[in-house]
Amino acid sequence: EYLLFQENIPDIPNLLNKDRVKSGREAISHFQAEYLVLDDGFQHLRLARNLDIVTIDALNPFGYEHIVPRGMLREPLESLKRADMIMLTHVDQCNQDKITVMINRLRGIVGQIPIVETVHKLMCLESSKGGETMDVTWLQGKKVFAFCAIGNPASFRKSIECLGGELLGFRVFPDHHVYTPSE
């Protein structure tokens, strides 16, 4: 993610540090930042904040009901009461009944804060060799072996299938895996 940000928005400082308070102070002192946007900052309670937006993946909204390492949650679901807004992602890959059940359950936890439904839409395909881009329709009817190292491989797989790619194989690596040349 860090490298993607560096490549796609190079004019915006992107700091990487497990100590979010330290990186926040650095952003303010070195770059005169007025606003800080943090990935995975919700559980860092030492941080002062003005707005907490929590993203929840509609494909696995409640993280197997357990905190890491048994599940995917970083905190108990009740912690969502601290959020100012919930963004429910991947709603395009779920049926409406499932979304309604999710929202009703979330309402029982968070009350009336905004819950925004979002979709992931593939805009283009980019070659790993030279950065050439192609329209997503290029995938239609193509035989594909796909691999990924992301938090939600099921969504990636579903995106390929929805675009008409014929999956010959699908390999999942751990989130943020650094690929070797042989892979």
Model regions: which residues?
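Phosphate/Mg2+-binding loops and adjacent switch elements
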Residues: 1-110, 115
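C-terminal accessory "lid"/substrate-recognition subdomains
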Residues: 61-183
